[in-house]
């Protein structure tokens, strides 16, 4: 009888258990954004907000090759949002913090990011990282499309272009 219980109890526990089913299809995950890597995109791709609000949008790279510098040419509707500030992301961070220069002119935001070399590296390792975070303030109702302009380029330590296959877009909808 004891042998039977030793056999039956674990069998009942085993048969009564059911594996959990998870839905791992977050549309904001880089794997689910429908871009061919290496790519640049905005995260989050869509923001619904109100007037007089501060919002943050990250400029992301998907499976980028190693780079030492970037010129990010960001286009936006300057009638509904204004740029407050730009903070470099971890993509160009090494032992030294990256250098960043920002020029904002009526709907065109030029961001220049530079990896500051150290004794071990003269460029980053590449990968999927945030290149920068842009903070916007909303000033009027409307929709602002975010685009990477034609001047967007990444360079490696030899000043060669880093290939980018695809560019994502973003939207800020101000109610």
Q: What are these language model-derived features?
A:
Residues 17-175:
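Acidic, low-complexity intrinsically disordered segments
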Residues 1-17:
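Sec-dependent bacterial lipoprotein signal peptides
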